[in-house]
Amino acid sequence: ALSSAASDVYKRQGGNDSMDTVMKLDDYAKYNNSDIHFIGIPKTIDNDLMGTDHTPGFGSAAKYVAASILEVVHDSLIYQLQSVTIIEIMGRNAGWLTAAAALARNEYNVAPDLIYLPEVVFNKDKFLADIHEVMKRKRCVVIAVSEGIRDENGHFLDDDSKYAKKDAFGHVLHSGTGKLLESLVFKEFGCKVRSIELNVLQRCAMHIGSKTDLNESFVIGSKAIDKALENISGHVMGFKRLSNHPYEIDYISTDVREVANYEQKIPVEWINKEGNDITQELYDYLYPLIQGEVHVTYKDGIPSYYSCKHLEK
C-alpha cells in the first residue's frame, strides 16, 4: 500500500520500463487519492526515451564508444594486413549508441568506415558490397554495427543464436550479431576478420565519462524535486535542445503517459541514403553530448569509486 508517511515524493530513474513503473504507480496513487508525487527521471544509455532531447548516461556511453573505436583504428593500422574489424554496439531497436561511433572521426581518421543501425533494413549482400567498395581505397576496414539490426523480414540477425537470453523485463538479450557477420566476411574475403562486442563496458566506463553528461544529470535530478514541489505528479523530466552551436538546453517535463512504452528512434533523415552511415545533422546532435572530461580520483593505480560492497548482499 502507498503511504505518504514514508515519502511525499517518489523519484524513479531509468529507461522505458522504469517510466512504465512511474505511470502505473501514479495511476494507482490517483485512484486511491494518495498525496505521493511520482516523478520520472530519465537515465539510459540507449537514449531512446520520448519527451526529451537526450537521456542522462548516453553522453558518457557515447564518449566511451567513440574513444574505443578510435583506439581500435590505431591498433588495426599497426599490421600490414588486409583486415575487417566489426564492432558490435548496444541498441536493440534504436541505434543512438552505434551512431556515436562516428564521433571517432577526426583530421586523420575517417573510421568507422561503415555504420549499420536497426532503424534501417540490413541486407547481407549489400553489406558485403559496401565492404568491397571500402577495400578499394583502404587496407583496414572498421565497421560499427548495432546489436539489433534486422533483415527485410524484421528478424534479428542473431535470432537463431544458441546464446539467446532474456532480461528481467522479458526482452531478448541480443548477442552474436558481430560473430555472425565475422563469419560472413571471412567466407567472402578470406582476410583477417575480428568482431568485438563492447557489451557492458559501454555503460560502466566512468573513467571516461562526459562532463556535460554529469553536469546535466545533477541538474535534472534537482529539477525533478522542484517539479514535485510544484504539486505535479506523473511527469517525466527531460531536456529541450535550444541550440547546437553553442550548445544550449532547457529543462522540461512531459506527462509520463506520453513517454512510457514508447521509443525514440533515430529519424530516417539523419541516416544516409545508402543506409550505411549517419548524416552531418546527426553528428551535430551527438557532438555536444560527449564534451568535457571527468577527472576521477585514483588509488593504487586504478579509479577509486564509492564502495559497492553492500550490493553483494
Q: Each PLM stretch: what is its role?
A:
Residues D46-H54:
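Glycine-rich, charge-decorated loop segments at or immediately adjacent to ligand/cofactor-binding or catalytic sites
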Residues A1-Y10:
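Single conserved hydrophobic/aromatic residue that forms the stacking wall/gate
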Residues L2, M23, L103, S222-I225, ...:
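Residues within alpha-helical segments
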Residues A1, K126-F127, V219:
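Short, conserved clusters of charged catalytic residues that mark active-site
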Residues R12-G14, D20-D35, I39, T55-R194:
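Accessory alpha-helical/coil subdomains and C-terminal extensions
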Residues N16-S18, K43-N47, G91-N93, V120-F122, ...:
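Acidic, glycine-rich active-site loops and adjacent beta-strand->loop/helix elements
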Residues D159-K313:
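C-terminal non-catalytic interaction/assembly regions of soluble proteins
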